[in-house]
Structure formats: C-alpha cells, structure tokens
A protein has these predicted regions:
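The conserved SAM/SAH-binding core of class I Rossmann-like methyltransferase domains
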Residues: 101, 122, 175
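Amide-donor transfer/coupling interface in amidating biosynthetic enzymes
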Residues: 1-98, 103-117, 125-136, 152-168, ...
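Structural motif
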Residues: 139-143
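Gly/Ala-rich beta-loop-alpha elbow adjacent to hydrolase catalytic centers
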Residues: 174, 178, 183
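Short glycine-rich anion-binding loops that position phosphate/pyrophosphate groups of nucleotides
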Residues: 144-148, 178
Length: 292
C-alpha cells in the first residue's frame, strides 16, 4: 500500500487514503478474521496501530450497536411534500394518489412510484389521520429504511400508521423495513439475522406461483415464520393469525428466501395489502421483481 508497483502509477494507495482522510488496514490474517465472523456473525469492531491495542479495547467496550439509535428518525423527510402534482397517465387521466411513508426511502423508489402515482412524500411519524385529512390518498406505501424495526421511535410510529391504514381498508404495500413493520403489526416477532442479506443475487420464491425471483436486498433483520419459528422454511404459506395482530385481518406467508427459508413477503387475505422484504425496483440490481 505504501509503494506503487505499476509503471503508470502516480502515487500509492497509502497517500491516496491519507489525502482523503480514509483509514486503511494491511498485514492482518484475513483467514482468521473470516473464521471469526463465520462463527460469531456480524460484529462491532475497531482497528488501529498494533501498539494501541489496549486503547482500542476500551473504545470497543464503549461502542453501542447502531441499531440502538432511532435511525429512521435520522433519515426520514422533515415534512410532507407532493412530488408530482397533477400527474396523469398516457391518456391524460389523473393518476391515483399515494402516500409514501419515508422510513429511509431510496430516491429511485420515489422515481418509480411517480411513474404510477401522484406521490405524497410523508415523514415516518406522520399519523394516518393527518395524512387522510391533508392529502386524501388512495393508497399507502411503507418504504425501506435502516435499523431495528422494533425500535420504540419513528419506526413504531410508522407501524401504527401502517396498521391504521390496513384497518381503514386502504390499499397498502410495504417493502423491506415496511415489510417488517407489517409483520410486527400482524403480531409476529422480528429478529436480527446472524448474517444479513446483502447483494443483488438473493433468490426468493413465490409460494403461490412457485416462481423464483433474483432480488436485491440489504437488511439485517427478518420477520419470524408464524408456523415454524425463526429461520425455518415455510412449507405452504398457510393462513396464520396471532393474538397480537392489530391489523384486523388474517395473513399468509407469500414469499420465502430460497437460501435460508426466512420470510420474504406477506399477503393479507381479506384486505388489499401485501409486503415484500426485497427491493423490487433494484437500482442497481436485477429487475425480476419490478412488476410487483
């Protein structure tokens, strides 16, 4: 990293990192590190000069997991905004209005939604009563976002809005964190995966059609299987209900991860609502699930 070894080099990696104030590391046993992560799952860590091991250990003891913070509150928008007022389809007819609950939404998701709806971009803690009173949406969308879905902060407020919309009979779709919030509202538990689902090649099976989608995912939590518990394949997508279900509707598991059997999507049986754990628009990534 210190000395460039190519004839066309104009500097070293070390100099480049220093110039941009980026930490780097070299000379470690990567195989030992791989084994440790494999055995213990995702870990908090620090790195620094070998002569400062004790200082780094003290820093590590004081670290708190990022999921302990109210991450949704840090990334949601400040207030509601109508993104594409007066939006029309190709034949000049007004598009239906969608309230998009921002739990950390990607801009490309908003762009895709604006192709199909007149979109009201709403903060995660905005109650359904205010959304209906001020914007009169035809449907509601709960977005992706960071952190623990069970955190008692903005994510919990978004879950209340999501559940209220379902009980109201409004069409609802949740993706990623929105899917997990729907699972919690249905009375299921969420849990931290030992290894999160990351990347653009995650296979997901639709239990109704038996089709497998290649999907883009980036999450560290999952919704438990209502029949067989956590990390167990769901054999049939059978209808399930729980005592803590506040949706006012029964649901079924519709999608599962083909690698580890974790729940990837829920369908409500008598309400116009469904969820998926992955990113349907996948920017960047595969477009198998874009019709969803």
């Amino acid at each position: 990293m210190t000395f460039p070894d190519h004839r066309d080099s104009v500097g070293s990696v070390h100099d480049l990192l220093v110039a941009h104030n980026i930490p780097g590391i070299e000379g470690i046993d990567t195989r030992a590190l791989t084994r440790r992560v494999r055995e213990h799952g995702t870990l908090l860590c620090v790195f620094g000069p070998s002569e400062k091991v004790q200082e780094m250990e003290l820093i590590l003891e004081e670290l708190t997991p990022p999921d302990a913070d109210d991450l949704v509150a840090q990334v949601t928008c400040n207030g509601p905004t109508l993104l594409n007022p007066g939006a029309e389809d190709s034949e000049g007819r007004p598009l239906p209005r969608l309230a998009a609950i921002d739990c950390g939404v990607k801009h490309n998701i908003l762009r895709e939604l604006c192709k199909r709806f007149e979109v009201v971009w709403c903060p995660a803690d905005m109650p359904l009563e205010e959304i209906i009173r001020d914007w009169s949406p035809d449907a509601l969308f709960a977005s992706n976002g960071p952190g623990d879905p069970a955190h008692p902060g903005a994510a919990t407020e978004a879950r209340k809005t999501l559940a209220a919309a379902v009980r109201h009979g409004m069409p609802v779709m949740g993706i990623c964190l929105g899917h997990q919030l729907m699972g919690l509202a249905a009375g299921l538990r969420t849990y931290k995966l030992r290894y999160g689902h990351r990347g653009s090649n995650q296979p997901v099976m639709d239990l109704e059609t038996r089709r497998v989608y290649i999907t883009s995912q980036n999450h560290g939590f999952a919704v438990e299987d209502p029949v067989q518990g956590m990390l167990a394949p769901h054999p049939s997508g059978a209808c399930s209900d729980t005592s803590d279900n506040v949706l006012g509707a029964e649901f079924m598991v519709r999608h599962v991860n083909s690698n580890d059997g974790t729940v990837e999507g829920l369908d409500l049986l008598d309400k116009p609502a469904f969820t998926i754990q992955f990113h349907p628009e996948a920017c960047p990534g595969p477009h198998d699930a874009s019709p969803l």
